[in-house]
Amino acid sequence: MAQAKKKSTAKKKTTSKKRTNSRKKKNDNPIRYVIAILVVVLMVLGVFQLGIIGRLIDSFFNYLFGYSRYLTYILVLLATGFITYSKRIPKTRRTAGSIVLQIALLFVSQLVFHFNSGIKAEREPVLSYVYQSYQHSHFPNFGGGVLGFYLLELSVPLISLFGVCIITILLLCSSVILLTNHQHREVAKVALENIKAWFGSFNEKMSERNQEKQLKREEKARLKEEQKARQNEQPQIKDVSDFTEVPQERDIPIYGHTENESKSQSQPSRKKRVFDAENSSNNIVNHHQADQQEQLTEQTHNSVESENTIEEAGEVTNVSYVVPPLTLLNQPAKQKATSKAEVQRKGQVLENTLKDFGVNAKVTQIKIGPAVTQYEIQPAQGVKVSKIVNLHNDIALALAAKDVRIEAPIPGRSAVGIEVPNEKISLVSLKEVLDEKFPSNNKLEVGLGRDISGDPITVPLNEMPHLLVAGSTGSGKSVCINGIITSILLNAKPHEVKLMLIDPKMVELNVYNGIPHLLIPVVTNPHKAAQALEKIVAEMERRYDLFQHSSTRNIKGYNELIRKQNQELDEKQPELPYIVVIVDELADLMMVAGKEVENAIQRITQMARAAGIHLIVATQRPSVDVITGIIKNNIPSRIAFAVSSQTDSRTIIGTGGAEKLLGKGDMLYVGNGDSSQTRIQGAFLSDQEVQDVVNYVVEQQQANYVKEMEPDAPVDKSEMKSEDALYDEAYLFVVEQQKASTSLLQRQFRIGYNRASRLMDDLERNQVIGPQKGSKPRQVLIDLNNDEV
């Protein structure tokens, strides 16, 4: 019996051992270790954003936990290790502390995000957000993620935002107590000491700020007292526009240039003490400015040498470059104002003239401009506007005016405007136009002149976005172009705006050669000009490729993206500069290479706005063969100077009116989207002022031309004549007929196919005809009126 019991107990022991071993084998399942390793690998990929999977994991955690996701990574790794080796879920005090710390960090991240941005996080689906984050390769600041967002959204209505801040502090303290083995009193003592130290530093900073504010106030008060003292020392300027009153039936309100003129002259009178060369103290200031300019020149020479070693990756920012000051422009001279009594008298004459012809109307307002005076007439009920317009010549006769322009009706008002030339045109300087608007945040802001009311008119080129300037010889077109270029030089640095100047007349724009804003030297050869426009088209297409790869829509968005990347990355990438292309005489280009120029202008005007490329085209021959329908339709902004006929005016601005302008800078401006014209007296700019601005710019930085943008040298046709005796006859025949083909030469000269083909090749090589384009006829590149013909 005893032996049997021993055997049974032995069997029980062996079976129990087998059971425990089998349990151990089951518990030691290798799948658990594989899962743990996989979790660790995924967490490492997410932390360092390695590859596609790493970015997706980090996007997911960023969306859920926001900035607190880094603590989540650590907690997941620790929990994985604990569960793997202890084979149970951790239920300790530190586990609770970690969870409380995670919740506290969610609150902290979301509160920081809320106070910084002042906006709420968007409630996007998780998968769509993760996909967008991966697709754009960026991880935006999302505060406390979706969990933090909903925690804050639920808590604020219950306990207010201030209560949430208190709860967050308590959660942080509780997590520290749970995670550490210190007693509560010790933790509270340390916390109180830290709070006291923080309040002490905060009070010190506030006291320092109050002291700085007090010093600034005292400095402002001192400057105001000095300005008052200077004004008291200054002699009073007598008003030369004191008018003797003429007895009238009633007083008509008069506005405009006389008031603006007095303002613009009272302001510079204070500056005269600073900038006049007559005062000895100002000579010292000028010497000091000259010394500073010499130092700037030395610094910029060094910077230019360093720029030349850099490849054509982009324009290097010259930190020491300073835009030219407005003091380089001449101060506007004081001029005799238009007599108000004379203006009142003409207003009464105008009313009487209209009454004599059966038109009952009253002059309600008079605006005195630099060149013309506008009489605003309000016709009585039932009077047709066309009746006033038909009295155009009678009104001019009654007022003894050269010509009058009638604006019927004035846009946005129930009145008719009659513009009568002044006896003497008041000169408008570019300095007084730019004084109120410069420096401008828009680097393409240019000054045009003053309108009828005497208000300065400045327009941004990037809103035009392209401009057509046309007018007869001597009307002020070239002065307007110089004013636009000078405005850009006064407002933009070389790395911000680039210029390409095309001047077939070879005399107007050569003064700008050597300025650092130029992409290439001023182009004077018409053949090179066509190639230069094609280079601009290629640059436009290159920029659109950059926009496509960077997922941006225009130059503004691309430059903002580059600025953000430059802040985050060590490698600095250059921003794209704006490019302004100015063609001073379009007619000369259309005679030499009409089709190429027209096609290039069409591409630029249709697509280049988003790429930051803007075109200004000027011509003194506003005919339909120069300003073609394609060019006109794609250039929305236009300036019309004085022209000889109403047909030319309609070619430029679509309506008549430019034939009645006075010349000497008198213009009609039609902006992009405007339904009416604005009459402007253009700003005058002397050659010496242009030269002073150019010298100031060139002394700081030399031109750094882009070789890729330079057009190829024109082919020397004297060296590329044909050996065939019939070449000259074929040349004249093709130019006269303005068409060319092998079969046409065969029939005309009764020659074989081979000889006719060789003649066609010679004509193409000498740039008489264009290349073959499939079944289309070849284009003849030489005009019949060409000097060579």
Swiss-Prot record:
One of its GO terms (cellular component) is plasma membrane. Residues 179-789 are cytoplasmic. GO terms for molecular function: ATP binding; ATP hydrolysis activity; DNA binding. Residues 1-25, 209-275 are annotated as: Disordered. Pfam families: FtsK_alpha (PF17854), FtsK_gamma (PF09397), FtsK_SpoIIIE (PF01580). CDD domains: TrwB_TraG_TraD_VirD4 (cd01127). The keyword Transcription regulation does not apply. Residues 209-231, 247-262 have a biased composition (Basic and acidic residues). It is a multi-pass membrane protein. Its main location: membrane. It is found in: Cell membrane. Belongs to the FtsK/SpoIIIE/SftA family. This is DNA translocase FtsK. It comes from Staphylococcus aureus (strain COL). The gene is ftsK.
